[in-house]
Amino acid sequence: MLSCAASVVLMTGCSLTGFGPDKEAERTYTVPGKVTALSATTHGGNIEVVPVDAGGQVKVTEKYVYNERKPSPSHEVKDGRLTLEAEDCGMGRRCEVAYRVLLPRDASVDLRTSGGDITVRGATGGIAAETSGGDITVKDSTARTAKARTSGGDVDLALSSAPDEISGRTSGGNVTIRLPKGSYAVEATTSGGNRKVSVPTDEGSAHKVTARTSGGDVSVVPS
């Protein structure tokens, strides 16, 4: 566990649901040293990754909602990888931990949440994102690889340079992939919605694109 200077604010407010969490807390801390990769896992909150200014410090904000027991997420840095992990509170207690991380653009990210949204902005490192019930959004990215999967939400991936491989998959929402000029090997399928591919396609292209949904629309369009 790395040491850090942290600020904590505790608030009480209205219950999010009739029997849901009714307390909130927030903690922000900086992470010393060089971070080249991020792994973040949370039981039910959102995850947001935004670029830090050149030379700036990596900073993490954790936002908690809970009822009886305050969450105790962990964080550590090993070999340049920052690992954030938040489990449920156990014994039927309800709680969520949401993350907002200021991160170098070139750091790779591996993000997983059981029920929240995932948002990544300005990344140039590889992206892997998975959520059970929320949306996944990638904006202004030049990542060479990006993979996004959600069971019930929408996927919207916008790249400003041609990736080597990009994929968006959802069981029940829409998939939209936005790409710059170029030709792409595209596999775009939907079982119950509309299909739109308006970028130049070439089965032999080195730029592989996969977009799949079982129940929504699928679109691969110019950015």
Which residues fall in each region the model found?
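Short acidic/polar N-terminal linker immediately downstream of export determinants
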Residues: 1-60, 65-67, 89-96, 195-205
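Charged, low-complexity, helix/coiled-coil-prone segments
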Residues: 17-19, 43-57, 69-73, 124-135, ...
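A broad, low-specificity signal for short, low-complexity segments enriched in glycine/proline
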Residues: 19-23, 36, 43-48, 71-73, ...
